[in-house]
């Protein structure tokens, strides 16, 4: 009996981990001078250790996902370049 309860609780715990939504963290910066815009990444593959490429006003940076919405994932694309971006 105890093993069945444990199995059900374990399954519920795994399900909650799999089904929980993940987001880029919300940036605390609301504006950035054009000369300070830098992209460390253009897509998730540019990041390591399970981090995502997230967009901020100062460029794209690798961040670890969070369960709180508010951030924005980097769009990437052919026009995205890493390094300092001058418009």
Curated annotation (Swiss-Prot):
A GO CC annotation recorded here is:
extracellular region
InterPro entries the record matches: Elafin-like_sf
Q: Where is the WAP domain?
A: 21-66
Annotated organism of origin = Lycosa singoriensis
Keyword list, A-Z: Antibiotic, Antimicrobial, Disulfide bond, Secreted, Signal, Toxin
The superkingdom of the source organism is Eukaryota
User: Briefly, what is this protein's role?
Assistant: Has antibacterial activity.
Query: Which Cys residues form disulphide pairs?
Result: 24-54, 32-58, 41-53, 42-80, 47-62
Specify whether Oxidoreductase is a keyword of the entry: no
Recorded protein name is U15-lycotoxin-Ls1f
Which molecular-function annotations from GO does this UniProt entry contain? toxin activity
Tissues with expression: Expressed by the venom gland.
Gene Ontology annotations of biological process type: defense response to bacterium
Summarize the PTM comment: Contains 5 disulfide bonds.
């Amino acid at each position: 009996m105890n093993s069945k309860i444990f199995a059900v609780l374990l399954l519920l715990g795994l399900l909650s981990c799999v089904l929980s939504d993940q987001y880029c963290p919300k940036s605390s910066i609301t504006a950035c001078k054009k000369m300070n815009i830098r992209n460390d990444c253009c897509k998730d593959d540019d990041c390591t250790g399970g981090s995502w490429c997230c967009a901020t006003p100062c460029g794209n940076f690798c961040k670890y996902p969070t369960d709180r919405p508010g951030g924005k994932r980097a769009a990437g694309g052919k026009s995205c370049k890493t390094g300092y971006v001058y418009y």
